[in-house]
Amino acid sequence: RDRSPSRGLGDVYKRQYYLLMTLSRNCGKMLWILFLFLFFGAFQIVLLYLFGQSIIAVDMFLNLVTTNSSEAMELLGNLTPAIVVVVILYIPALVLATISIVRKRMLSAAFIRRERKRAFVVFGVSLLSLAGAYVQDPGYELKSDLYPLNVCYNVGLAFQRTALTQNYHHTSKDFTFHAQATHPEEKQEVYVMVVGETSRALNWQLYGYERETNPLLVQQSGLVAFPKVLTESNTTHKSVPMLLSDVTACSYDSIYHRKGIITAFKEAGFRTAFFSNQRFNHSFIDFFGREADTFDFIKEDSLDFSYNPSDNELLKLVEQELAKGAKKQFIVLHTYGSHFNYRERYPSGDAFFTPDYPVEAERKFRDNLVNAYDNSVRYTDSLLARLIGMLENQGTDAALIYTSDHGEDIFDDPRHLFLHASPVPSYYQLHIPFLIWMSDSYREAYPEHWEAVTANKEKNISSSSSFFPTMLDLGGIKTPYRDDSQSVATPLYKMRPRVYLNDHNEPRPLDDLGMKKQDFHMLEKQEINT
């Protein structure tokens, strides 16, 4: 269903403000009293500029505290038109309101009484139209559909989730996976889980893209690329925790009582490591990463705010970890992948598709944006190929699994959508790459996994539901929290109906999200079931 603000920006919305403005003869005073709603309006303008629809979601408020400063600055630098509009609309009004307060300018009592009566009449009529909305649409909800009540409700949810997150270490401290290793104790083995960022399947050569964005991986033996994989969230702070734990869209609120996959491997006797090329986000990604024996958020290693290491810097840490020679090793990488600004995700000398500059967030620069984006995908190709090469050189049983947290809009159709994390997702934000690689010795030792992976390749898969159990399955980690019906490394895998984690942490079918016909056309074109 459509959750755009246009559903609430009607008579009820306009008249309630007009009625409130009649509560004081000093208009400036009332304007400042209603400042919170002015802030919502300014925020909404920026949101509409980015996504073209939807009210301010809970996730948008949470992003204010989970998005790191470098990401925020990269984005704000490309939102100039929206920021200019906000400044023109709101700053003069607030200045005039301040002058009105200081100079004690008052409207006449007669004028206020007359306008208040008119506002009451029109407000009453608009309430009747609201009742009509309930009759016409049985699914109509004040908390979801009436602006600004829906935004206020979302603010409350954001505060609630923030409090739960801050209490996470207390609510999860007694959790255990009861994990056990099932592979032979004497065998040396290494497993690597790579979580990418903002990489969409449509731009991967492995999935039929006409450009050479995966020149190395297309030649890689022992690699299976799953073409029909969707994420259950288009936001990093939700998607990545689902990849790193057993929670899914159907059980997301249990995350406050869970630990991550690193703890499962630790319980089974593995040496663990977590290396990230992202800054702290003060949420579950940090919590799960810090469970490891060794962890490093490399952007936090420098006091220089502008420090911008490439993802390949993570390979140095992997090399050091492998050199420790532990018999059982589990390594998790969280890359920066293809996050905007795309041009900053790879060294200038690695630009293959040009021109890749300028890349401002404008439709007229789409060709440049796509070039830069494809260069970032090509850089991920190099990263994964080098990582696989390092594992091959170990000569041990090894497996690697990769997916991205979500995809990206790049002005792909007449809607002119850009970036990700929009309250209503698009096809381009949902369809992501999903890869599994196994070493020769691993395939010889566990042929049943290789057979299952190749047999499940063309099936519809949710990364959010399958990444965790598949990694545990490949690693031979047995736990009651491993759902084998969602592991693509077993013949027990079963396709489930598609769901998406909405802004209120509820699982919803794709046709109940407000997605447009263009999105379903693209899903159908890719032969992806909805």
What feature does the model see in each segment?
Residues R1, R7, D11-Y147:
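Transmembrane and membrane-interface helices of multi-pass
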Residues C27-L31, T263, F280, G389-N393, ...:
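Membrane-interface soluble catalytic domains
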Residues V125-M193, T198-E360, S463-S464, P469-Y493:
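Active-site-proximal alpha/beta segments of enzymes that process anionic O-linked groups
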Residues V192-M193, S376-L419, F468-L472:
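Metal-dependent active-site segment of extracytoplasmic phospho-/sulfohydrolases and closely related
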Residues G208-E212, T396-D397, T403-P447:
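Histidine-centered active-site microenvironments of extracellular/periplasmic hydrolases
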Residues F274-S276, F330-G337, D374-V377, A399-S404, ...:
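Short beta-strand segments
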Residues K316-E319, Y357-L400, I436:
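A long, amphipathic alpha-helix that forms part
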